[in-house]
Design a protein with these regions (language model features):
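Carbohydrate-associated surface elements
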Residues: 166, 186
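Conserved nucleotide-sugar phosphate-binding/catalytic loop shared by glycosyltransferases and other
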Residues: 37-77
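An aromatic- and histidine-rich active-site surface loop
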Residues: 46, 85, 89, 103-123
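A conserved mid-protein helix/loop that constitutes part of the nucleotide-sugar donor-binding site
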Residues: 14-25, 205, 212-231, 246, ...
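Aromatic "clamp/platform" in nucleotide-sugar-dependent glycosyltransferases that forms part
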Residues: 269, 288
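Nucleotide-sugar donor phosphate/pyrophosphate-binding loop at the beta->alpha transition
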Residues: 87-88, 124, 133-156
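A short, histidine- and acid-enriched strand-loop-helix "catalytic/donor-clamping" loop
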Residues: 12, 65-68, 112, 123-142, ...
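Glycosyltransferase donor-sugar binding loop
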Residues: 38-45, 187, 210, 237-250
């Protein structure tokens, strides 16, 4: 059996990426003879983490069909996206012809390139959905209406996997319910050398938010809360851990402008996130809506 997986990003910070990593690890353990391949935007720690379990990979830059709120989306922009989608789907088709997979799986809903390429070649395709974009990503607009995107996902998929019963009930309203299944995920923390997860609490009250620096992940709201706490004369330490996708400079400026350098520490990303769980008294969920809040579950473990 040959399987190919498409990741929307190259870092390993998000819950969707770590679910994909767990899936690859589990498949290779249960079926060591299966060949697993990945397509992702470029090099990064996701590829490093997945390398022991895959037999090959391809870098391919693909545009999301979600764009910033400040972008106008008219007929010209839609036609431009369709042209680029066609171009890179054809490129991906060439790679699929070379590796000859039995099944393709797209991780998250942000682009349809693998699904289209699989359709062109008659390869079965599964969509692994970790979000409900019309309520999760309020900072983004779809290039096409969400009802069209959901219909495309339905038409281009033999199977649709979601991460919770809530997501299953939600998508059954807009897709073929027989195709949709929710899966139970085991959350496991790696052993980390030098970290005492049962250590005594620290002298400073410490909070942690893990997530990519994006406008919908809550970093700015947390910084505003920290500012108010400090203004009331209370001591607090806040860790913000995650890769930058464009929002980190705004957070850094806010920290400097409000004199919070002694209260906020930014960590661009670490593979040893357990270390920061052990440092925190409270871990915050990084968005107002989660289909499966993996970070919160990890922290509770």
């Amino acid at each position: 059996m040959k399987l190919v997986f498409l990741s929307h990003v190259s870092d390993c910070a998000g819950g969707a990426q770590r679910c994909l990593l767990d899936l690859l690890r589990g498949l290779k353990h249960i079926h060591p003879d299966w060949q697993l391949y990945m397509v992702l935007p470029g090099p990064g720690d996701l590829l490093d983490a997945c390398s022991p379990y895959i037999d090959g990979y391809r870098f391919l830059q693909m545009e999301w069909w979600l764009v910033g709120k400040d972008m106008d989306i008219g007929t010209r922009e839609k036609l431009s996206y369709i042209r680029k989608l066609s171009k890179y789907s054809i490129k991906l088709t060439r790679y699929l012809r070379r590796i000859k997979p039995d099944y393709g799986m797209t991780n998250t809903v942000v682009f349809p390139h693998l699904a289209i390429s699989c359709k062109m070649l008659g390869i079965k395709h599964c969509w692994f959905i970790h979000e409900i974009p019309d309520v999760t990503w309020l900072n983004l607009n779809p290039v096409f209406e969400f009802r069209f995107i959901f219909r495309a996902i339905d038409k281009l998929s033999n199977k649709i996997l979601v991460t919770s019963r809530y997501a299953e009930f939600h998508y059954q309203k807009v897709m073929t319910s027989a195709k949709i299944s929710s899966i139970t995920q085991a959350v496991e923390l790696p052993m980390t050398v030098g970290v005492d997860v049962k250590c005594d609490r620290h002298t400073r009250y410490t909070i942690l938010l893990v997530g990519a620096f994006d406008s919908n992940k809550g970093q700015m709201e947390l910084l505003q809360a920290v500012k108010r706490i400090v203004a009331e004369g209370k001591d607090i330490l806040c860790y913000l851990v995650g890769p930058d996708v464009g929002f980190m400079p705004k957070c850094q400026k806010y920290i400097q402008d409000n004199g919070l350098d002694n209260n906020v520490k930014i960590v661009s990303y670490t593979q040893q996130v357990v270390s920061y769980y052990a440092l925190a008294d409270v871990v915050l969920v990084c968005s107002t809506f989660e289909t499966f809040g993996r970070g919160a579950v990890e922290a509770q473990k």
